[in-house]
Amino acid sequence: MTDVLPVVAVTYSPGPHLERFLASLSLATERPVSVLLADNGSTDGTPQAAVQRYPNVRLLPTGANLGYGTAVNRTIAQLGEMAGDAGEPWVDDWVIVANPDVQWGPGSIDALLDAASRWPRAGALGPLIRDPDGSVYPSARQMPSLIRGGMHAVLGPFWPRNPWTTAYRQERLEPSERPVGWLSGSCLLVRRSAFGQVGGFDERYFMYMEDVDLGDRLGKAGWLSVYVPSAEVLHHKAHSTGRDPASHLAAHHKSTYIFLADRHSGWWRAPLRWTLRGSLALRSHLMVRSSLRRSRRRKLKLVEGRH
């Protein structure tokens, strides 16, 4: 009997992306997998259809839109009470956590598992992630310090090649297997014992920064976050953020503030936190206004094109 690898995906009306996720999964590993859909209240019927189509898919409704990290935590916590689809045991100590808009590259999961055997202190391993246009997304980064992270957050949208953003995103480094500060939570191979040791994802983060926070806490507990570019996936990430960019931007800034404020606590640092909060609020206002202007221009061009 072969051990089964659990794959946890959080769904919220994922649309056609889920089919690509599941169809490509068979190419990613020769090992049997069981997909656990932590559903945060989908209304498009896609997760239910996937359960009917794929015998190795199970639907685990969370009861509400709990956010990414909370849904993952609850699902991983249930693994001890479940087994594979035919009663097989789980792969010892490993679980895949991924967004449902990931499309798996051939052999990508096997490459992550192979790397795990080379890094006995790896708490999380992440693949090379490509955007839909084929470019490499900077998914393996340094831990954001107050200066580096703050300057990236404030200046990045308006000056993408500023030195703080460039250092933080590590875009000038050639892809190589190495420990990094943190890995994108859109696709991770996670050591369950390490994940449990640090308490899983911090559930204060509804979305964004929960992966940065996890990488930080894993590192402080003596675990490594390892980038494995021999494993490749494609991430169709615009499907969720495109629905309501203003609210997603606000959520990102809230999570950024939580992360940095946690690491700069104390009454004597209150002015620093006030400055950070104000800077993030200003950034949010400017970016939302810019987004609305672009949207109005696009609509105007469409109207003009009809005449």
Swiss-Prot record:
pH dependence text: Optimum pH is 8.6.
EC id: 2.4.1.289
Catalytic reaction(s) noted: N-acetyl-alpha-D-glucosaminyl-1-diphospho-trans,octa-cis-decaprenol + dTDP-beta-L-rhamnose = alpha-L-rhamnosyl-(1->3)-N-acetyl-alpha-D-glucosaminyl-diphospho-trans,octa-cis-decaprenol + dTDP + H(+)
GO process terms (BP): polysaccharide biosynthetic process
Coiled-coil features, chain-numbered ranges: none
Gene3D superfamilies per record: Spore Coat Polysaccharide Biosynthesis Protein SpsA, Chain A
Temperature dependence comment: Optimum temperature is 30 degrees Celsius.
CC cofactor: Mn(2+); Mg(2+)
Summary of the function given for this chain in its UniProt record: Involved in the biosynthesis of the mycolylarabinogalactan-peptidoglycan (mAGP) complex, an essential component of the mycobacterial cell wall. Catalyzes the transfer of the rhamnosyl moiety from dTDP-rhamnosyl (dTDP-Rha) onto the decaprenyl-pyrophosphoryl-GlcNAc (C50-PP-GlcNAc), yielding rhamnosyl-decaprenyl-pyrophosphoryl-GlcNAc (Rha-C50-PP-GlcNAc).
Top-level taxon of origin: Bacteria
Family: Belongs to the glycosyltransferase 2 family.
Gene disruption: observed consequences: Cells lacking this gene lead to irreversible loss of viability.
InterPro entries linked to this entry: Glyco_trans_2-like (IPR001173), Nucleotide-diphossugar_trans (IPR029044)
Name of the featured protein: N-acetylglucosaminyl-diphospho-decaprenol L-rhamnosyltransferase
GO CC terms of this entry: plasma membrane
Organism of origin: Mycobacterium tuberculosis (strain ATCC 25618 / H37Rv)
